[in-house]
């Protein structure tokens, strides 16, 4: 006979701490946007970083595009507190008010070298920050991670692969405009929108 042992999942400890910090609702929302596979692998350190450094909901896509630690197929890491510490407050505020400035910063500061990553395993966002050299995919993940750390809703579209963000310029994130990121363009363009009408 083997002795019985209770195994407590990392998210149980995480939720207990969140309840004590009066953040239970946001903690549950965070767990909801993380896939079942990621929940098995994610550490409490990652969960706490993204819960405590994502701000408060301000847009309809806050949970999926700010709070969510997953960007693409990178290893999930606790990067938000790191970026909030590393980026000077005045620069962070400038990026929030003008996200194209963040696009331009990435274009100028991150050197692209796709040949250094022949296995196509994405670098961590913090690794890109420290090295200032990355392949294009790692740079894209880095941009989204940095934007989310600043409270800017950002994502990589699962269908088109486009990097996108919702603009703060409208001061109304519920109706904020979505922009495509183009690191080669001098100016960022608004993503095309339209209405689909289906009759049957």
Task: Name each region found by the language model.
Residues 132-140:
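A conserved hydrophobic secondary-structure block that centers on an alpha-helix together
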Residues 124-127, 131, 161-170:
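Beta-rich nucleic-acid/ligand-interaction surfaces
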Residues 121:
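Juxtamembrane segments of multi-pass membrane glycosylation machinery
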Residues 1-115, 125-128, 138, 148-149, ...:
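N-terminal accessory/pre-domain segments preceding catalytic cores
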């Amino acid at each position: 006979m083997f002795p019985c042992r209770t195994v407590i999942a990392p998210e149980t400890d995480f939720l207990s701490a969140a309840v004590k910090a009066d953040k239970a609702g946001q903690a549950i929302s965070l767990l909801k946007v993380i896939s079942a596979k990621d929940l098995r692998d994610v550490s409490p350190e990652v969960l706490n970083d993204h819960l405590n450094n994502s701000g408060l909901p301000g847009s309809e896509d806050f949970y999926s595009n700010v709070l969510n630690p997953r960007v693409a197929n990178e290893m999930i890491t606790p990067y938000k507190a790191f970026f909030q510490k590393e980026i000077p407050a005045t620069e962070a505020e400038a990026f929030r008010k003008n996200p194209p400035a963040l696009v331009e910063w990435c274009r100028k500061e991150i050197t692209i070298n796709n040949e250094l990553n022949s296995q196509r395993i994405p670098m961590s966002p913090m690794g890109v920050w420290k090295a200032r050299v990355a392949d294009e995919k790692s740079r894209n993940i880095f941009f989204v991670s940095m934007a989310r750390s600043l409270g800017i809703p950002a994502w990589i579209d699962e269908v088109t692969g486009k990097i996108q963000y919702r603009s703060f310029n409208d001061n109304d994130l519920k109706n904020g405009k979505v922009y495509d990121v183009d690191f080669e363009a001098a100016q960022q363009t608004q993503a095309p929108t339209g209405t689909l009408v289906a009759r049957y």
